[in-house]
Curated annotation (Swiss-Prot):
Involved in oxygen transport from the lung to the various peripheral tissues. This is Hemoglobin subunit beta. The modification N6-acetyllysine is found at residues 60, 83, 145. It comes from Sminthopsis crassicaudata (Fat-tailed dunnart). Belongs to the globin family.
Length: 147
């Protein structure tokens, strides 16, 4: 699994404490659906996702994005036990939803992009590296049930 130093954990917590879960979650999920449109097949019940404007203005995308990022907050709280933290979600996404585990990596990378955009100069290369490690760890934990 991922080992994060005390300094890296500090970088992650400093940014996370300023994150708007609703806004950033909606933005990250919306960008995923726009940039990787095949991911929308998991969200057929969300209505029209055929345009960027439709995706970003979709209340269900916004709500689920907030839910996803709230869950990601569990990773921030449990950085030393990502596998255990996401065991049930891994099982759900593997056994019931059949989500391609690559999608977890894609969403994690988009989250890092959103954070970089929101935090600008505070999102230094060191901060980005710490976040990349965390999102990679979360993606691995979510994909655990697939192995």
């Amino acid at each position: 699994m991922v080992h994060l130093s005390a300094e890296e954990k500090g970088h992650i917590n400093a940014i996370w404490s300023k994150v708007s879960v609703d806004q950033t979650g909606a933005e990250a999920l919306g960008r995923l659906l726009i940039v990787y449109p095949w991911t929308s097949r998991f969200f057929d019940h969300f209505g029209d996702l055929s345009s960027a404007k439709g995706v970003m203005g979709n209340a269900k995308v916004q709500g689920h994005g907030a839910k996803v990022l709230t869950s990601f907050g569990d990773a921030v709280k449990n950085m030393d036990n990502l596998k255990g933290t996401f065991a049930k979600l891994s099982e759900l996404h593997c056994d019931k939803l059949h989500v391609d585990p690559e999608n977890f990596r894609l969403l994690g990378n988009i989250l890092v992009i959103c954070l970089a955009e929101h935090f600008g100069k505070d999102f230094t290369p060191e901060v980005q590296a710490a976040w990349q490690k965390l999102v990679a760890g979360v993606a691995t934990a979510l994909a655990h049930k697939y192995h």
